[in-house]
């Protein structure tokens, strides 16, 4: 890591932002924060309503940067600092009040300009901000004052701030009644109603009528005008600039009623947009409430309720039947069934006993458990999932990058078109100034990019949140999009298509001079001393069948590399190994017929081992890695989804590989591969198919996972490695979640494309009404508002995609 990168990482602070009304506002906020003195960089996460600030900035500075929409900024809640690393100056804050991504961007920009802030990064999806450097909550809230953002500390690394905040719990978010939250909108709407009543009774030109409409415009549009005028002064054009100019123009030509309608409908549109984004974020907030905040802990012989922040590694937690588990740990006493649906998406409770791992947020259904704590609260699996999902929501997907770039040029172009519509017909074609200025104002309103800007953030946040609740951790919008474009999927065999746990499938005694139990006892005594992976299957079989082997004395035990093992028992040397070993021993009864029987077992995907002496064959035992019950159905569903190329990669021999591959139904089989061979094959597949996914355990096939377009790891709930290294993790070690993830990804892509097409299409239709002069401010604002509402509702459908 170079020095500049290290500095940014050290000074990152995260803030929550309240008040974003749209994605465009988040972007504007980010831009403002970046311009703050002392801020090196900032990144807004619109989906999470957060901003990461790299550098020094106060909450006041951040709220000032967000003043255009009265954003409220709050540092994220402080978390336990175990070992200060290069990220020790990164401060995380939750931000309440983000109304749009543009506002989040503006807030990020404002935070970056704060003195003492080296960089900042807003996570709009998680409503958080990372601030790198020193900044107080007041400074951050000042940077977000344009949208009255509230900033709440979540993770503060700066020692001076830490000392003050260490014992401070994150404040509870206040539930503001609807009528209070939207009091100005309701009052302005009431004034419009009275205005139209006066218009009906007293006429359009009556002073009372005009004053009622003017009052409605001023009250309902105060926050709009505050931002709009600031933008005009700075030549910063966004949707609020368009609306401000349109309302001013309508007022100038005397269209008070329509100007007030534009203000009110725009405010309603923003409120609905904010509501939609909050609904999308709720999927992650619900994860935060899964784990209890307190746990019953035994200390010094006493059982006491302790807040999870104060529980240490090594503490003993008592979990009663029907209670949720508060912390990750290992069971030291008790047996129960635990519902892990919150973490893994599994609907069926899992049997748990001593030495089994349990996770925070899961439900203990039956027995009393004593659990030894293995992780601090911020390091639990559910905490990591929440953190990674919030980070994922903050990553800009390719579709979002396109929309952001498009919107940057779109708004100024709309203003130019509106000006041309207002000026050209009267100047060159003898048109009426009043008529065409009115048409130009309508073009400004219809050109508002609300629907375009909001579609991708809501879609990505909804999809990632839904996936997380069903046990699929997707670590970014980019991976969500790429998964939908996958043309081929490579499967590592062991632990993915198979269970990864070998079992004894066949055992046949071929000599009448020895009993079955006696022979298996000899096999077990020899395999007990072996380091071969398949030995565990034999030991497990012996335990299940109550076969004792401790009284069998083995002498001169030797491992025969690549062939098997040997040992002397009561003066006789026994051998266990491959057919090749017994061929080399020239055992007399190793016939062609016997060899064919062994090949039959091998062709069934089993590893056959022979037991005997140098004189005779006593028996044959076969061990196999059991195929998952779901593997065949998963491959079938993937083929039905249009993914024709499903390839199994394995280091097994060709016979075993072909047997398993044929059983599960993959389209291609690659056997006898080393890890490097798997990597090379993935590169070859990418060259041939373009987008390729690789699914494995995330450990021994890490190079191949990294080389694939999308790396998918199994068993994320039990292994930190899988969560941290893969692009997507199947938390419940459940392969059946893969088709769901592909379907969700494709549906997300389709909805984003449909939304963008619809939003642009509705605007083109409305703009065409300019030609005959039919476009009114009513039609303009209703088309924009309607498009925004329909786009938001369509995106929220992703929260309801089921895991079939």
From Swiss-Prot:
Membrane topology: Multi-pass membrane protein
Domain HMA: 11-74, 89-152
Origin superkingdom: Bacteria
CDD domains assigned to the protein according to its UniProt record, in alphabetical order: HMA, P-type_ATPase_Cd-like
Catalyzed reactions: Cd(2+)(in) + ATP + H2O = Cd(2+)(out) + ADP + phosphate + H(+)
Record's keyword terms, sorted: ATP-binding, Cadmium, Cadmium resistance, Cell membrane, Ion transport, Magnesium, Membrane, Metal-binding, Nucleotide-binding, Phosphoprotein, Repeat, Translocase, Transmembrane, Transmembrane helix, Transport, Transposable element
Any one GO cellular component localisation term in the record: plasma membrane
A GO BP entry: response to cadmium ion
GO molecular function, one term: metal ion binding
Chief location: membrane
Record: active site: 492 (4-aspartylphosphate intermediate)
Subcellular location field: Cell membrane
SUPFAM superfamilies associated with the record: Calcium ATPase, transduction domain A (SSF81653), Calcium ATPase, transmembrane domain M (SSF81665), HAD-like (SSF56784), HMA, heavy metal-associated domain (SSF55008)
Binding site for Cd(2+) 2: 100, 103
Ranges that cross the membrane: 183-203, 207-227, 248-268, 413-433, 441-461, 749-771, 776-798
Binding site for Cd(2+) 1: 22, 25
Disulphide-bonded residues: none
InterPro entries reported for this sequence: ATPase_P-typ_cyto_dom_N (IPR023299), ATPase_P-typ_P_site (IPR018303), ATPase_P-typ_TM_dom_sf (IPR023298), ATPase_P-typ_transduc_dom_A_sf (IPR008250), Cation_Transport_ATPase_IB (IPR051014), HAD-like_sf (IPR036412), HAD_sf (IPR023214), Heavy-metal-associated_CS (IPR017969)
Chain's role: Couples the hydrolysis of ATP with the export of cadmium. Involved in cadmium resistance.
Protein name listed in UniProt: Probable cadmium-transporting ATPase
Species whose genome carries this gene: Staphylococcus aureus
Classification of source organism: Bacteria, Bacillati, Bacillota, Bacilli, Bacillales
Gene name of this polypeptide: cadA
